[in-house]
Every structure is written in C-alpha cells, then in structure tokens.
Curated annotation (Swiss-Prot):
<keyword id="KW-0457">Lysine biosynthesis</keyword>
<feature type="active site">
    <location>
        <position position="67"/>
    </location>
</feature>
<keyword id="KW-0220">Diaminopimelate biosynthesis</keyword>
<dbReference type="GO" id="GO:0019877">
    <property type="term" value="P:diaminopimelate biosynthetic process"/>
</dbReference>
<dbReference type="GO" id="GO:0009089">
    <property type="term" value="P:lysine biosynthetic process via diaminopimelate"/>
</dbReference>
<comment type="pathway">
    <text>Amino-acid biosynthesis; L-lysine biosynthesis via DAP pathway; LL-2,6-diaminopimelate from (S)-tetrahydrodipicolinate (acetylase route): step 3/3.</text>
</comment>
<dbReference type="Pfam" id="PF07687">
    <property type="entry name" value="M20_dimer"/>
</dbReference>
<dbReference type="Pfam" id="PF01546">
    <property type="entry name" value="Peptidase_M20"/>
</dbReference>
<dbReference type="InterPro" id="IPR036264">
    <property type="entry name" value="Bact_exopeptidase_dim_dom"/>
</dbReference>
<dbReference type="InterPro" id="IPR023905">
    <property type="entry name" value="AcetylDAP_deacetylase"/>
</dbReference>
<dbReference type="InterPro" id="IPR011650">
    <property type="entry name" value="Peptidase_M20_dimer"/>
</dbReference>
<comment type="similarity">
    <text>Belongs to the peptidase M20A family. N-acetyldiaminopimelate deacetylase subfamily.</text>
</comment>
<dbReference type="InterPro" id="IPR002933">
    <property type="entry name" value="Peptidase_M20"/>
</dbReference>
<comment type="function">
    <text>Catalyzes the conversion of N-acetyl-diaminopimelate to diaminopimelate and acetate.</text>
</comment>
<protein>
    <recommendedName>
        <fullName>N-acetyldiaminopimelate deacetylase</fullName>
        <ecNumber>3.5.1.47</ecNumber>
    </recommendedName>
</protein>
<keyword id="KW-0028">Amino-acid biosynthesis</keyword>
<dbReference type="InterPro" id="IPR017439">
    <property type="entry name" value="Amidohydrolase"/>
</dbReference>
Length: 370
C-alpha cells in the first residue's frame, strides 16, 4: 500500500477549491490512463472523474465516491509534503479520501472482483456542492451503480475503527447570506442615519431564538453565524452590514421551518429598524441517510474484521446525501487517530495507517461480501 500513501502525499500538496481542482483532476487522470483500456473506462465531469473498472461478470455495479477539493485554510502541520498552494489545505481529509479510492481502484484492476466497480471522484464537496450536478449529469446514467458507498475521516476514532449507523448519519445543511442596507452618517448624529450595526446585532440575537423556541427540543438543529462585517471606521455609522452563517437539521421538515423563521425574523427587523435586508440561501445539502439493509450487511462484515461502532448522528453537512437520495447505500466514519486536531483545523494530519487498513477492508468486502 505504499502506492496509496504516495498518492495521498502528492494530493496533499495541491489542495484546490471547489470546481477548480484542475491539478487534482489531472493527477487522477494520469493514474487512470495507466490502466488497460479494456479494463478501465472513464469520463470527466467539470473537475471530477467517473471511472468504471470491469468485473468478471459485470452483473451489478457497485459505486464508491471520493471527494477531492481542499479548503481555504493556511496549513500549519509542518509536514515535508505540506500544501504548495498558499492559503489552501486539505484540512478535511479529502486527500485521504481520494488516495483510498485510487488505491482501491488499483487493487481491483490488478485482481478483478465479480461486479463492476464505479468510482466517482467528486469536486466541490466543501461548496458550492458537486454531488448534485454530478448525479444530474447524463454521464451518471452511464455509470449508475446499484449500491453506493463513501467514507469520511474521523480524527476522534483510532485507526482500525469504522463508525456508522442506519438512517440519518449527517445533517441537512444550508448556508445563509444576509446583507443589511441602511443609511451611513456621522456617529454624532445617529438620528440622521439608519444604523445597520444595531440591526445586525438584533438580528443575530433573534436568529439564536429559532432553535430554542421554534424547533421540537427532542430534535437537533443548529444556526450558527460564523462571519459578520460592517463599518469602515469608529466614528462612521455603517450603512451596510453582512452576516454569513449555516443552518443544520436532522430532518427536512425542521430545515424548512428554520428557513421560514429566518424569513419571518428578517421582516420584523426591517420593520423595527427601518433597514432593507437581502436574504440569500445557499445550496442545500440533504441529510445523509444510510440504507438499513446496506448498513446491516456492511456492519456485519466489519464486525468480523475490525472494530465497528454504531455512532450517533452528527450535525456535519455532506453532499453525499444527494447521491443516497438516488441510490441505496451508506457512508461511514474512518478512524484516523488525530485526537488533538479536528476537521477544518490547520494542523489536521490523519494517520496514514488508516489508508491501507480501509483499502484492504473494502477490497475484501467488495470481493467476497457484496
């Protein structure tokens, strides 16, 4: 498995934002083109890649998805193969995800399994979302699998551990972008202005009442405002203010309620403070819902070969949910033993021993158990 670890290190050097993974796509294509054309076929979609490895019978098609984009985070790992792109890093482990797919693909090319195996190297998971356009592409019908699998690295679990659950594994997620317009002016004459900072502060506080007062307390939902911006200097009342945030919910009904309550509160803020507000919702990521039958089959296999944990649902957002709305399948957490640094942190450094572990596990599963 030295090959897969080498792939991870090369990919780690070239993190790229969503739909701009040009070097990453070229690197993946270089690997795929080295295989015999009678065994491996492929197509590109945007900066992603569809790949089919022919099986011995080809009676069914099993799908495996790996996301490939990086994050706008300055790396602080100090690794000898750290990011060569300033301000960008594989801080969510997508380099690991892609290298696992490349290693598994190589294994299956060398030692064919019975079924065809389709690999989806997907762009833009971190945004604006690559799964939905990828499965809506006409190419998807050419590669459509009967079952779909995917994983995500989990720093909190040790190497050798797989964690998942039937039903909802990850939450539905949607970005919120709000611009407040008022009237700027001198700080000494607030009565001649419309202060967007005061409206911004009130809006932030009111948004935080939605989950506690509009959502069933037995359900899990989150609204987080992660970015605010307003003003140009201390003695000028701001005529414009910005808020960016995210909403998460474990079911679609609650997500719709969150959206409606945001609209309601914004109308009230406009009336109360005399401002005008532009509200934009980003792409919605659907819940990742694991198929009961697939989870039962996979977890039974893992329990015989590794450590399996049935975990709780997480408020993490993942656009793999789009694929699982179309195809029965599952996603699971892969332990990578990095307890001191979590996802989206500049020091994330997954234990590379997890790479050969899960390649061997999935190869065995696809070969003998699926």
């Amino acid at each position: 498995m030295e090959y897969a670890i080498e792939m991870r290190r090369e990919l780690h050097k070239i993190p790229e934002p969503g739909f701009k993974e040009f070097k990453t796509q070229a690197f993946i294509l270089d690997q795929i083109r080295s295989y015999p054309e009678d065994r491996v076929s492929y197509d590109t979609f945007e900066t992603g890649v569809f790949v089919r490895v022919k099986g011995l019978t080809g009676n069914r098609t099993i799908g495996y998805r790996a996301d490939i984009d990086g994050l706008p985070i300055e790396e602080a790992t100090g690794l000898p193969f750290c990011s060569e792109h300033p301000g960008f890093m594989h801080a969510c482990g997508h380099d690991v995800h892609a290298s696992i797919a490349l290693g598994l693909l190589r294994r299956i090319v060398e030692l064919p399994v019975m079924d065809d195996v389709v690999f989806l190297f997907q762009p833009a998971e971190e945004g604006p979302g690559g799964a939905e356009p990828m499965i809506k592409s006409p190419l998807f019908e050419k590669y459509r699998p009967s079952e779909m699998y995917g994983l995500h690295v989990a720093p909190e679990y040790p190497v050798g551990t797989i964690a998942s659950r039937p039903g909802v594994l990850f939450a539905s997620a949607r970005e919120v972008h709000i611009t407040i317009y008022g009237q700027s002016g001198h700080a000494a004459f607030p009565h001649l202005t419309i202060d967007t900072v005061v409206a911004q502060a009130a809006l932030i506080m009111q948004l935080q009442t939605i989950v506690s007062r509009s959502i069933n307390p037995m359900n899990c939902s989150v609204i987080t405002i992660g970015k605010v911006d307003a003003g140009i200097r201390e003695n000028v009342i701001a005529g414009r203010a910005l808020l960016d945030g995210t909403m998460r919910a474990l079911n679609g009904t609650d997500m719709e309620k969150l959206e409606q309550r945001v609209r309601d509160i914004i109308r009230g803020i406009e009336a109360s403070f005399g401002v005008k507000i532009d509200l934009q919702f980003g792409n919605r990521y659907y819940e990742v819902v694991n198929d009961q039958r697939v989870v039962d089959k996979f977890s039974s296999f893992v329990k015989m070969n590794a450590n399996y944990i049935e975990c709780d649902a997480a408020m993490t957002g993942e656009d793999f949910g789009f694929m699982l709305k179309e195809i029965p399948g599952m996603m699971f957490w892969l332990g990578v033993n990095n307890a001191t640094s979590g996802l989206h942190q500049p020091t994330l450094n997954p234990d590379e021993e997890a790479i050969p572990f899960v390649i061997n596990l999935l190869d065995h599963y696809f070969r003998e158990y699926v």
